[in-house]
Amino acid sequence: MKYIIMCGGNYQNWYFPRQLLEVKGEPIVARTIRLLKERGVDPEDIFISSDNPVFKQYAPVLHHENRYETDIFDIDNNGLWTDAFYPTDEPCTYLMGDVVFSPDAIKTIVETETDDIEFFASAPPFSPLYTKPWAEPFAFKVVNQPHLRSAIQLTQIFMRQGAFRRKPIAWELWQVIKTQALNVIEYDSYVHINDYTCDVDGPEDLAKIEEKMPYETSMERIG
């Protein structure tokens, strides 16, 4: 199983990738890599997908251009979130690059088994440690890559037909993968991660997450 941290997108309000924002002195992407290794993932199986060479200092970069824009209601914008997946035929777990994962979240993602596709996200009722009033997506574990590719194509067809209320992101893709009703989140259809794990939209989000995080130690960081 390969692990690809998705660090693409075009965030116009930022002067640097938000995946490099620091949580307790550690870049978010570096933290994710560290937690994967601490959970037993071989460093040679960890990659970053991006067209930004700055990420080479953290892990091998799989060049992947994704011009996704943050305005999910701008249907006419050419950038699509569904283009974020690096194409491969190998079993692969795709992790959102701007998510601050807890050790337990990474454990759940690594240890969950599937022969098709699994999705990981928060869900109500939320943990007291969670910092947003809505659910957020965190990762996809994909063994059946042809299924993912066909679902992405179908999601984009539905978008062009006007079937979605916004540009499709992880939730809409999962609805297509599971052949669910569109525009409705079925919270019982995926693996729940309910702790402080959450994505970061800005420094204010990071500060909230840091307040909720317990004291954590890492032998790698100590050594």
Walk through the language-model features, giving the residues of each.
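N-terminal nucleotide-binding beta1-loop-alpha1 segment
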Residues: 1-16, 20
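Conserved core of the sugar-phosphate nucleotidyltransferase
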Residues: 101-194
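Short phosphate-binding loop-to-helix
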Residues: 55-93, 100-103
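Short, polar loop motifs at secondary-structure junctions
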Residues: 49-55
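Hydrophobic targeting segments
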Residues: 2-6, 29, 45-46
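C-terminal catalytic/acceptor-binding lobe
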Residues: 188-223
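A short, N-terminal amphipathic alpha-helix
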Residues: 27-43
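Short coil/turn segments at beta-strand junctions that form active-site/ligand-binding loops
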Residues: 1, 43-44, 89-91, 97
